Amino acid sequence: MVILALNRDSHFGDSGFIAKAATENGGSLFMFENYKTFKTQFAGRELIVETGKTCELSNGSCWVHYGETVVMANVTASPKPREGVDFFPLSVDYEERLYSVGKIPGSFTKREGKPSEKAILTSRMVDRPIRPLFPKDMRNDVSVVMTVLAVDPDCSPEITGMIATAIAISISDIPWNGPIAGISVGLVDGEIVLNPNLEQRAKTDLNLTVAGSAEKIVMIEAGANQVEDDIMLDAILKGHEEIKKIVAFISDIQAQIGKKKFEFESQEVDHDMFTQ
């Protein structure tokens, strides 16, 4: 006999619930046959990955918890290439939700508005490191959507979203030469800090975001207050060392549950474009 019970879950703070089944041989998540969870440490905080929980019709999907920040990433691809284009049609959307910070839209329609400037910049920040790793001759539409479900001020949802995206693409059947990961680096009182919290970000002399693979750095975004070159280089290298650990973690997840990459129709590439 199966008994359905609603147990409190922390995904949405006190308001989150998850359906569980009690069976004679113990409880099981009968609603989620492919449910898996993975855990690791990231810059001194626990990072938890959940897969097989939602969006089973997408090519790849996951939830990533970093502190109390929760981001869901979904990636889908068209089965056939788009006709009449000479570029890779990738779209990346970072969607903020007011309920992630405990608010409800106060407009007349009570609905979310257009993307904020921060959301647009975050979408571009995630696009830059992942786009070059797709096959240059692929023309299938690929859509990445990151949805912020909960926000912890001390744990960046932007970095969490980048990692969630890398995991979703890695475990999907979409061809990709990843994984990558990202990290935020600060400089507080002369000390390099990885993924600084809210208080540290308020007084940091360096606001650095690094994305990279196990072998190399693929994206740097930075703002600083007269930081010396050797300190900047040290911050980048220390950030990359932490990135390597997360990349290895993602590779392990991919080895366990990753799908076989599909074959795509190769489109001609104008190689003269790369020599100009």
Language-model segments: which ranges?
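Glycine-rich, flexible beta-strand/loop modules in the N-terminal catalytic cores of phosphate-handling
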Residues: 46, 58-142, 148-150, 155, ...
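Gly/Lys-enriched N-terminal cap/neck module of very large, oligomeric protein machines
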Residues: 52, 57-61, 143, 178-182, ...
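Mobile "lid/hinge" segments at catalytic clefts and subdomain interfaces of large enzymes
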Residues: 173-276
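Short, Gly/Pro- and small/polar-rich lid/capping loops
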Residues: 31-56, 61-62
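Short, Lys/Arg-enriched N-terminal segments with co-localized hydrophobic residues
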Residues: 13-30
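Intrinsic disorder/low-complexity segments
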Residues: 3-6
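Stable alpha-helical structural segments in soluble proteins, enriched in small hydrophobic residues
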Residues: 129, 160-172, 235, 242
